[in-house]
């Protein structure tokens, strides 16, 4: 098919409606282009539970093999399980998933050997160009005289063992945990990873179903964790965990059913990773995580490094600084011991170890890491984003004790509060995050900024 790749190839991945925007013929071209751009002689491929995933990943495999690459198929897996395979086997990888997007969508997340990201500046632009040319009839390079082999391999047990070796769970007290897999890949990975741990596991929506019959598999949207919150309370559970569709993100709910801020989880895991590393090391966090994160990092002997929002920035900084851990307020958690890739499962194991290693409830445990009042991210439709950012800067430039920085959008910081305004890359939106030392101040700053934006 001749496709509009401008709508299909995003900043970090490929994503679109099947078969309207892409199909198996295009997937085969992506496989060939991936091998050509990465110069790979072998690759690994995994896929999620979407109805179209097996056929699309199979077509990608054929395209790669035709270019002479040996293909290892690991079948059904979470995205972080694919990253594990890419790291452990030292092979470029492709994961077929559209995370929490509706059933008619599918996509490809690609990485180089060692789970190094493939984004626009690291190969995706070249892959897109080749696929565009070939889909429009340009001749492809001749097929390899010796096509690659296609073999299957199960990596789930090895993936689980790798994660469990990174967190000491031997001495934890028994815990009751409700896990909402959202009919996504958490239903595939959680039983194997949690097997043998002193956990009373209450599974919620573990049946793999790419039509998402119960709720969207996006735990950052409050309406999607309502069932989990209710079940935690009904079961008297110690905590709840919610995974997104491809199970690379994990959201935590405490024993009262209250969502735990991903910034608090970032701070908690950072403290534990620093302790594992002898009380030293660099931790990367994006600029909309809480003030709590750099504070906790410094208190535990580490060096915080602040970066832009977006996983490619975190992974780049992780590599540059040799960081031990990185966290985003979107519930992505990155680990040096996991090839700088993100794994919500490893973050979940850290939470279980921290909670099970003491007697108090999770709400008390995370209170030490959740020190400020946050607004969450608030979107406003704005036609001229640049003009709006300039107006906001002008409005605050005459005030005392104000600093500005432009690392990502505009961050305005005062003694007792800060806010960040970022323009969306894809929509006419400004995204606002506010944090303050107390709820009253946060609300006042939030309302003032929103009034200026929406005037």
Regions found by a protein language model. Give the residues of each.
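An N-terminal, well-structured beta->alpha segment
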Residues: 1-62, 66-68, 92, 149-175
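Short glycine-rich phosphate-binding loop at a beta-alpha junction
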Residues: 41-48, 72, 176-178, 281-287, ...
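N-terminal small/polar loop signature for handling phosphorylated ligands or for N-terminal nucleophile
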Residues: 43-106, 164-165, 192-253
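Short glycine-centered, acidic/aromatic-flanked micro-motifs in structured strand/loop junctions
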Residues: 46-47, 179-181, 214, 254, ...
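A short, gly/pro- and small-residue-rich
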Residues: 104-129, 253-269, 339-349, 355
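Gly/Ser/Thr-enriched, mixed-charge loops and adjacent short helices
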Residues: 106-235
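Proline/glycine-rich low-complexity loops and linkers
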Residues: 125-160, 255-329, 333-335
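Phosphate-binding and adjacent anionic-ligand microenvironments
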Residues: 239, 279-455
